């Protein structure tokens, strides 16, 4: 057909075909299918089928031969044999001529169609190919993963095989161990029966032994009573002999003293004295209660001389004597005073001190009505100024007066120095009345010489103590021979002069001339005290005593000046009278007022004179006129002068003038020297008023200071020196100008105010002196008093209407001067007087400038805040107002209670340089002053000076920081952990919020700065509570292993709240933080940590102080293993950790779209397996096999699993819990009896908590089916939990600040930590793990700054409520572990035997002293008061060594005798804390044996009686407590080793406080042990006693009952056979080697004893 189609010849047959086709078309038009017959229809159908087949063939041909498509166009007609022709025919017949188009009109179109089709097919094929390639790669990856899974499966299978093999081995071992234990139980039961049988036999023996012991006890009691009786008799006899000895010594001393006086009297009579020898030597009282005892090491024996100012007690004479140290045995060359003075020596005076003490009690010194008589050794200060020892610079300013030219005052009345002759005590010290007749015809030079040599005779005594002399360099204890020679020479001259001074007949006495026998000046006391060579040094600490009242100008005598203190017994009585020159001196009647004396004389008329007191302190300063003052000017006035220079008659005339004497003010007086001197002033008023005779003046002036000037100058001098007596006499004169001013313009009032003499100021003001008189610089007395800080003078001047606002030439006001010198009292007084605070000086300074310039904070506070109260209620308002500025300037703001009273203009006032007070404070670095200024609201810190500098520009670094934080807002930053639930998980002690620091928000603070500050504060806080850098704990080993980080950071914060408004970290609001905080009145910033609600554990970490990584690890274990149990000691926060982990898991699952439920069940003793099954089924954790798995997450927490047996409770659930699938079902029977198969699904988590340190027995079978998390007390996280928690508690207590290392709170918290650790360490050492405590109980430790007592009380409550009961239960549980099974352990706990009670009390006492009381921060006295609050604290155990760091190693010979020798202290001998003080002396050994009550007694083995009621000793071993068990013996050993470790005492020293023990020894005991044996309280027992023997010897406390320093030990009750000595000795060596007391090993030949309990054999052998 292709050939035909391809031919180029024309087809001749087409024409007839066309004609036939046209006819057919015409027929077709008329063709009707309905009219066709059946055959036609069949033919038509066959034709159509043929055409269809032809079409199929064409399609197939076209597909096979595509080239023919391009050839079809050549053919115009087709043959009938060509199937293509049929297609052409159908085409032409089916359409009109217009629509007909050739099939292959264009080969290109056909090619394009084919190419388009091919392109589509190619794209489809490429797509399918890429998909096939991707499927191939995926398949290869799946193959690789499958291979890896296969390998892992193989490894896991191998590992499971290993675990199965190990488990099988463990099970076999456990089965074998169970068999062994069952066999041991049977053996022990048999042994128990044998022991019970032997106990019956032993009871008989112990009864006999008890009878013997009772007999020995009675004998011992009798011997003890005899010994105590003898001791009492010895004590009584010793006291009697001592009293008799004292009486004899006193009598001997009195006799020696009388002999010395008689010798001196005879010697005086031999010299032919002109005085009357008929004066009788008065007798002394025989009261020997106050006899003094001489000291041999103090040189010559001295006796005290009575003083006139001592109070009258039991004397018949009322004349007081001055205490003065005189030699009891004078040398042969002792000089004598003149015969006209006589005195007595009191034998009952205590040894006196040469010199004076400024700290004399004012009440004791002012109590006497007699005048003040100074010691002669002190008058040297009056005549010559301060001693060189006290004022070494005196020689550079004022030349010293030579001893040859300056006389000393005569003897004080009633004082005899180195002479037995009684002195004339007729009147007061400064009385002008003459008692010795001086005749007017006497030459003044002779009188002065006589006075001089009499005065110098008193300079030194035999001890080298100078009494009255100018500064001399050769007066010392090493030059006594020289002194004696000088005294002899002086007394020789005195005897020669006495002829010229004898009374002359017919010569009237000179009026106003004081006698030489009564001319004595009272010495002042320098600021640094007197120092005499060879004498005791005077105390120079306190100022002179303050007089009880101030003297006025009344005409009544005032009390005398307080006597300068000399150590004299105040209770002694002076019993000496005196007669002077036929003038009988009578004691003053008791009805007279204090300070007055009645002088009764036979010849002269009666006259009385006031007692003129001295000033208590003297300092030489420059006088206003610039001249030096004589030393005599410093003395007090004692008499009026003679009628010379036209002055008035003296005071001792017939008309007596009573002038009040005045006690100087309490402050040290600085006298001002006289201004000028002239030759005519030798008899000036000041000299005669001082008690010196005018005839002595020329001698005084030679080589001494310049003479004094006239009356006005004297007035100034008296006012400057505070000489009230002289001042009052001068003011009483007529015509004296009280307002006289010297060259500098200083008036008398100004001088008195400058030196602070308030009494002189009062006198001058009463004399109408000008109160506002100014000196040449414009300063008034008020200015001077304010500048010097003389408060009383200021009060007087203000009361006299002084000008309070007076300004000097420079503009200085009194307020300015007071602020400049920091006198706060004066400032307050001036402010109350209404002074103006704004007055400026010439330089522009105000009082505020002056206060700031000196840096005086108190002065500045007064100026700014003190509001002067109203005149009517000033005294009432003074206290509350003072509180406004008396607060600490740096911590609290004064605006809280008061507002500044000064204006802003005054605070901002600038001086000539433009500097304000703030400039001054900032430039000098006075931060406190600047802070007070900044509190004023009107301060302008930006104010500039003339150099254009602000306060910040001139400030120091500290002040710059203060200015930068001037207006900073202080906002506390808190950390919140949200709500910790539930409450029964131990969360009561967890604080929800803690203040960590205070944020400072300034105006320029941005939100970025604020965010950084918050982050930095959080980071610093987390580091502070994690690190131990600021913490000092005893146990360094614990801290070395502690992780220093808890894993928290700033990113742990979930949200931050400013007040009540949340603030996303890093976000910036429109207002600045400053404006935001002020606008919203934000009081705090709270940082909320992410918690379990967010699926995090940060808040749990902060609340519990468990590191975050640890908690995350726990959470991973729960999610991975599904079955986890937390176990540890009670109080290890197991429940809290489990519940918080469950909460975190719940919120995580809920966030993932799963529902979750937490089921908590508390297991108690009655919780059964059926109840647990119901719990699993009801919570849908255990589901039937037929039921489909649930998608709900279920978390079950079983708490307190230690209350039941794990094997019984969880035994049936172990297999389904381990294999959670339907392939491993387990059949459980319900309560109704129906059984069904159940299984645990994968969405169930089981957590349990056990308050037990370790598992025992059958519970170990459960261990392999759970993942166990052990919370050890000595490992993380429990180890560092308590330190971190308490550290955070301290930081919160101090409001975010870490306290100083010296703060006592550190010691308190460190003590609480050490108690927990030492307690657990001791309990672990005892082998009682069930008594271990977790840190939960110690989380409530109170942190009270400065009050450690609260922590000790809390510790006592914890000890009594928790620790002690647990320890008791653990000890009883262990001690009764091998008792008879029928009795039961519970019965032993309820009714413990006496031996068990003894062991428990011993253990409690050891734990209390070793773990609790050791390291307590309280002082020992306070700790002893709190010890009784602890249970077991009264047990008689040594607490000295346990409280101190180490026990005492040295013996104290008299330690025990001090408390036990007296029978009265017999009952309290056990309470004396001297158990660890061994005594090596024989007596000490004997007494120590008594005190320790046979410390070798075996406490745990001897079955002690009750510590409360029983007194008798028994060795009956109770049937309920067999100490033959291994556990009991081990417990005793551990108690022993615990006592011997560190500073603890040995357990063998524990003794029953109500029982007395006896020792038994053999005749062969060594001498070292003979002392305790010979003690009458310890009778000797028989040599051989049947011991308690056994198969196995158990080491007990007697193996260590030796004394600490190697002294032979006190023995136990029974001896040990010879065969057991070697073993006992080895035990002794082994136990002693573990002790820190370094005891030497005991010789094997010494007596060694041990307890052997199992009585199977009896051996009777004596010890060797």
Curated annotation (Swiss-Prot):
An example Gene Ontology molecular-function term:
protein phosphatase 2A binding
The protein's UniProt keywords, in alphabetical order, are:
ANK repeat, Cell projection, Coiled coil, Cytoplasm, Methylation, Phosphoprotein, Repeat, Synapse
UniProt xrefs under PROSITE patterns: ANK_REP_REGION (PS50297), ANK_REPEAT (PS50088)
Coiled-coil spans are 119-276
Q: Name one GO cellular component term.
A: actin cytoskeleton
| Primary localization class, coarse | cytoplasm
Repeat keyword on record: yes
Which InterPro entries does this UniProt record tie to the protein?
Ankyrin_rpt, Ankyrin_rpt-contain_sf, Cortactin-Actin_Reg, Cortactin-binding_p2_N
Query: Where are stretches of biased composition, namely Polar residues?
Result: 1587-1600
Ranges for the ANK repeats: 710-740, 744-773, 777-806, 810-839, 843-872, 913-943
Query: How does the annotation summarize its subunit structure?
Result: Interacts with CTTN/cortactin SH3 domain. Interacts with STRN, STRN4/zinedin and MOB4/phocein; this interactions mediate the association with the STRIPAK core complex and may regulate dendritic spine distribution of the STRIPAK complex in hippocampal neurons. Activation of glutamate receptors weakens the interaction with STRN and STRN4.
What is this protein's function?
Answer: Regulates the dendritic spine distribution of CTTN/cortactin in hippocampal neurons, and thus controls dendritic spinogenesis and dendritic spine maintenance. Associates with the striatin-interacting phosphatase and kinase (STRIPAK) core complex to regulate dendritic spine distribution of the STRIPAK complex in hippocampal neurons.
Q: What is this protein called?
A: Cortactin-binding protein 2
What organism is the protein native to?
Oryctolagus cuniculus
């Amino acid at each position: 057909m292709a050939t035909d189609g391809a031919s180029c010849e024309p087809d001749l047959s087409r024409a007839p075909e066309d004609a036939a086709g046209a006819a057919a078309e015409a027929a077709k038009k008329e063709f009707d299918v309905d009219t066709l017959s059946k055959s036609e229809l069949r033919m038509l159908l066959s034709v159509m089928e043929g055409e269809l087949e032809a079409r199929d063939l064409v399609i197939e041909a076209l597909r096979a031969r595509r080239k023919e498509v391009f050839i079809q166009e050549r053919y115009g007609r087709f043959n009938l044999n060509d199937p293509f022709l049929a297609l052409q025919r159908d085409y032409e017949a089916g359409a009109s001529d217009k629509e007909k188009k050739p099939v292959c009109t264009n080969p290109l179109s056909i090619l394009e169609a084919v190419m388009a089709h091919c392109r589509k097919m190619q794209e489809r094929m490429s797509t399918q190919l890429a998909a096939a390639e991707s499927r191939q790669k995926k398949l290869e990856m799946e193959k690789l993963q499958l291979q890896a899974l296969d390998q892992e499966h193989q490894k896991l299978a191998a590992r499971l095989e290993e675990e199965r093999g190990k488990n099988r081995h463990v099970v076999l071992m456990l089965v074998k161990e169970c068999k062994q234990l069952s066999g041991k139980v049977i053996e022990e039961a048999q042994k128990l029966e044998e022991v019970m049988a032997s106990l019956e036999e032993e009871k008989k023996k112990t009864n006999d032994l008890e009878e013997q012991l009772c007999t020995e006890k009675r004998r011992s009691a009798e011997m003890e009573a005899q010994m105590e009786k003898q001791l009492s008799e010895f004590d009584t006899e010793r006291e009697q002999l001592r009293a008799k000895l004292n009486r004899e010594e006193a009598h001997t001393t009195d006799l020696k003293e009388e002999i010395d006086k008689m010798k001196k009297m005879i010697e005086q009579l031999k010299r032919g004295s002109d005085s009357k020898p008929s004066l009788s030597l008065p007798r002394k009282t025989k009261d020997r209660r106050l006899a003094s005892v001489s000291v041999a090491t103090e040189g010559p024996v001295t006796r005290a001389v009575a003083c006139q100012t001592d109070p009258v007690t039991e004397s018949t004479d009322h004349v007081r004597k001055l205490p003065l140290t005189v030699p009891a045995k004078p040398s042969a060359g002792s000089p004598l005073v003149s015969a006209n003075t006589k005195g007595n020596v009191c034998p009952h005076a205590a040894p006196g001190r040469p010199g004076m003490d400024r700290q004399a009690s004012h009440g004791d010194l002012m109590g006497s009505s007699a005048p003040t008589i100074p010691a002669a050794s002190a008058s040297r200060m009056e005549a010559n100024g301060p001693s060189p020892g006290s004022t070494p610079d005196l020689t550079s300013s004022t030349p010293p007066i030579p001893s040859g030219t300056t006389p000393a005052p005569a003897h004080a009345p009633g004082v005899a120095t180195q002479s037995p002759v009684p002195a004339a005590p007729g009147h007061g010290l400064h009385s002008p009345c003459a008692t010795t007749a001086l005749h007017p015809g006497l030459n003044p030079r002779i009188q002065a010489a006589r006075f001089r040599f009499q005065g110098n005779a008193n300079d030194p005594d035999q001890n080298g103590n100078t009494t009255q002399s100018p500064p001399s360099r050769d007066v010392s204890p090493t030059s006594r021979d020289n002194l004696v020679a000088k005294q002899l020479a002086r007394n020789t001259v005195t005897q020669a002069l006495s002829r010229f001074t004898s009374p002359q007949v017919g010569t009237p006495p000179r009026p106003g001339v004081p006698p030489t026998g009564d001319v004595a000046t009272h010495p002042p006391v320098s600021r640094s005290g007197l120092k005499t060579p060879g004498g005791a040094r005077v105390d120079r600490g306190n100022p002179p005593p303050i007089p009880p009242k101030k003297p006025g100008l009344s005409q009544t005598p005032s009390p005398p000046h307080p006597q300068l203190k000399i150590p004299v017994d105040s209770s002694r009585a002076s019993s000496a009278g005196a007669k002077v020159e036929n003038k009988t001196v009578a004691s003053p009647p008791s009805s007279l007022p204090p300070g007055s004396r009645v002088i009764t004389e036979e010849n002269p008329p009666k006259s009385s004179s006031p007692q003129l007191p001295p000033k208590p302190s003297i300092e030489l300063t420059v006088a206003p006129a610039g001249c030096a003052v004589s030393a005599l000017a410093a003395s007090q006035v004692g008499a009026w002068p003679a009628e010379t220079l036209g002055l008035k008659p003296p005071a001792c005339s017939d008309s007596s003038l009573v002038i009040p004497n005045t006690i100087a003010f309490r402050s040290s007086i600085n006298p001002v020297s006289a201004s000028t001197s002239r030759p005519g002033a030798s008899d000036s008023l000041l000299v005669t008023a001082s008690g010196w005779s005018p005839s002595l003046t020329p001698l005084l002036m030679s080589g001494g200071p310049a003479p004094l000037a006239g009356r006005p100058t004297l007035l100034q001098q008296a006012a400057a020196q505070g000489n009230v007596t002289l001042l009052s006499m001068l003011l009483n004169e007529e015509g004296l100008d009280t307002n006289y001013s010297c060259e500098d313009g200083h008036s008398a009032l100004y001088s008195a105010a400058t030196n602070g003499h308030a009494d002189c100021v009062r006198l001058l003001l009463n004399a109408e002196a000008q109160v506002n008189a100014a000196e040449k610089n414009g300063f008034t007395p008020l200015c001077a008093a304010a500048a010097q800080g003389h408060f009383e003078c200021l009060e007087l001047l203000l009361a006299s209407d002084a000008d309070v606002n007076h300004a000097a030439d420079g503009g200085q006001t009194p307020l300015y001067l007071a602020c400049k010198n920091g006198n706060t009292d004066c400032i307050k007084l001036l402010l109350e007087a209404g002074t103006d605070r704004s007055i400026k000086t010439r330089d522009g300074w105000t009082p505020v400038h002056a206060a700031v310039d000196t840096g005086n904070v108190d002065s500045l506070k007064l100026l700014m805040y003190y509001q002067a109260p109203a005149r009517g209620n000033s005294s009432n308002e003074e206290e509350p107002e003072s509180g406004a500025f008396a607060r600490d300037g740096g911590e609290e703001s004064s605006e809280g209670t008061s507002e500044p009273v000064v204006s802003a203009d005054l605070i901002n006032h600038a001086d000539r340089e433009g500097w304000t007070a703030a400039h001054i404070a900032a430039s000098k670095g006075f931060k406190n002053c600047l802070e007070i200024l900044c509190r004023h609201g009107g301060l302008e810190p930006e104010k500039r000076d003339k150099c254009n500098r602000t306060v910040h520009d001139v400030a120091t670094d500290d002040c710059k920081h203060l200015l930068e934080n001037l207006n900073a807002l202080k906002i506390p930053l808190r950390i919140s952990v949200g709500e910790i639930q539930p409450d029964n998980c131990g969360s009561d002690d967890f604080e929800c919020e803690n203040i960590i620091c205070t944020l400072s928000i300034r105006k320029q603070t941005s939100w970025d700065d604020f965010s950084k500050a918050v982050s930095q504060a959080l980071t610093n806080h987390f580091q502070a509570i994690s690190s131990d850098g600021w913490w000092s704990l005893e146990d360094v080993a614990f801290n070395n292993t502690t992780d220093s980080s808890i894993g928290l950071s700033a990113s742990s914060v979930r949200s931050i709240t400013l007040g009540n408004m949340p603030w996303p970290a890093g976000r910036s609001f429109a207002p600045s933080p400053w404006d935001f905080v002020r606008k919203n009145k934000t009081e705090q910033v709270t940082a909320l940590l992410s918690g379990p609600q967010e699926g995090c554990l940060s808040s749990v970490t902060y609340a519990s102080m468990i590191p975050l990584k640890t908690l995350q690890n726990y959470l991973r274990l729960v999610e991975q293993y599904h079955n986890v149990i937390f176990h540890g000691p009670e109080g290890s926060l197991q429940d809290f950790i489990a519940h918080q982990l469950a909460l975190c898991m719940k919120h995580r699952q809920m966030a993932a779209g799963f529902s979750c439920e937490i089921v908590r069940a508390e297991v108690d003793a009655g919780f059964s397996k059926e109840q647990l099954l119901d719990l699993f089924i009801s919570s849908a954790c255990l589901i039937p096999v037929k039921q489909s798995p649930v998608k709900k997450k279920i978390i079950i927490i079983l708490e307190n699993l230690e209350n039941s047996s794990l094997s019984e409770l969880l035994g049936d659930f172990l297999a389904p819990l381990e294999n959670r699938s339907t392939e491993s079902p387990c059949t459980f029977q319900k309560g109704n009896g129906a059984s069904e198969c159940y299984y645990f699904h994968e969405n169930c988590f089981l957590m349990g908590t056990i308050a037990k340190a370790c598992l025992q027995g059958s519970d170990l079978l459960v261990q392999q089916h759970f993942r166990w998390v052990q919370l050890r007390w000595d490992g993380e996280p429990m180890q560092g939990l308590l330190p971190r928690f308490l550290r955070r508690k301290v930081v919160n207590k101090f409001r975010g600040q870490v306290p100083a290392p010296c703060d006592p709170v550190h010691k308190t918290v460190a003590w609480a930590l050490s108690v927990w650790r030492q307690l657990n360490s001791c309990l672990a050492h005892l082998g009682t793990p069930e008594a271990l405590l977790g840190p939960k109980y110690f989380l409530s430790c109170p942190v009270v700054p400065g009050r450690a007592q609260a922590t000790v009380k809390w510790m006592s409550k914890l000890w009594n409520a928790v620790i002690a009961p647990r320890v008791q239960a653990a000890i009883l549980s262990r001690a009764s572990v091998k008792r008879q099974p029928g009795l039961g352990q519970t019965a032993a706990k309820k009714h413990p035997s006496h031996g068990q009670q003894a062991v428990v009390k011993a253990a409690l006492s050891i734990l209390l002293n070793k773990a609790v009381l050791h390291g307590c921060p309280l002082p020992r006295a306070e700790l002893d008061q709190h010890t009784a609050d602890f249970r077991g604290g009264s047990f008689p155990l040594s607490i000295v060594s346990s409280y101190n760091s180490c026990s005492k190693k040295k013996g104290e010979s008299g330690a025990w005798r001090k408390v036990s020798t007296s029978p009265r202290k017999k009952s309290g001998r056990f309470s004396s804390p001297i158990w660890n003080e061994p005594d090596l002396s024989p007596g000490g050994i004997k007494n120590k044996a008594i005190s320790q009550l046979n410390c070798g007694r075996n406490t745990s083995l001897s079955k002690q009686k009750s510590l409360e009621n029983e007194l008798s000793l028994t060795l009956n071993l109770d049937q309920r407590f067999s100490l033959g068990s291994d556990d009991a013996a081990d417990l005793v050993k551990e108690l022993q080793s615990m006592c011997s470790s560190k500073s603890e005492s040995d357990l063998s020293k524990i003794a029953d406080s109500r029982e007395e023990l006896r020792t038994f020894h053999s005749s062969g005991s060594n001498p070292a042990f003979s002392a305790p044996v010979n003690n009458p309280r310890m009778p000797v027992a028989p040599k051989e006693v049947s011991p308690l023997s056994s198969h196995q010897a158990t080491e007990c406390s007697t193996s260590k009952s030796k004394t600490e320093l190697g002294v032979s030990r006190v023995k136990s009750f029974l001896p040990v056979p010879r065969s057991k000595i070697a073993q006992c000795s080895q035990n002794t060596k082994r136990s002693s080697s573990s002790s820190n007391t370094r005891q030497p090993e005991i010789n094997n030949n010494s007596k060694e004893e041990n307890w052997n309990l199992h009585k199977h054999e009896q051996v009777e052998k004596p010890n060797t």
